[in-house]
Amino acid sequence: MDIPKDRFYTKTHEWALPEGDTVLVGITDYAQDALGDVVYVELPEVGRVVEKGEAVAVVESVKTASDIYAPVAGEIVEVNLALEKTPELVNQDPYGEGWIFRLKPRDMGDLDELLDAGGYQEVLESEA
């Protein structure tokens, strides 16, 4: 299971990659593998203000649908429109082209409350 060390993670299997004053968000390799083949992604609305832990998007697979939660509070500033036509990018490249949304955090310091790669690995091991 791939867990890049350049980003933060949540116990609900989202990743958060700081880029300047924004954070790119997607789901982990573990999450996409557990979901199976992704067939649809319900993207959040740009401009929406969200709280940490709020359900902001939905990823639907052939097996189930799963809410995607905001890792930190802030404003959605961009969504990955490529997922409307090619939702399988979430499976093919969960840490790259399969990102889901970008948000501008209310406080970048909130990222420090998230897990690093090692902490996320421990979460996966405890769930196994």
UniProtKB/Swiss-Prot annotation:
One of its GO terms (cellular component) is cytoplasm. The glycine cleavage system is composed of four proteins: P, T, L and H. Monomer. PROSITE patterns: BIOTINYL_LIPOYL, LIPOYL. It comes from Thermus thermophilus (strain ATCC 27634 / DSM 579 / HB8). It comes from the Bacteria. This is Glycine cleavage system H protein. Belongs to the GcvH family. Residues 22-104 form the Lipoyl-binding domain. Its cofactor is (R)-lipoate. InterPro entries: 2-oxoA_DH_lipoyl-BS, Biotin_lipoyl, GCV_H, GCV_H/Fam206, GCV_H_sub, Single_hybrid_motif. The modification N6-lipoyllysine is found at residue 63. The glycine cleavage system catalyzes the degradation of glycine. The H protein shuttles the methylamine group of glycine from the P protein to the T protein.
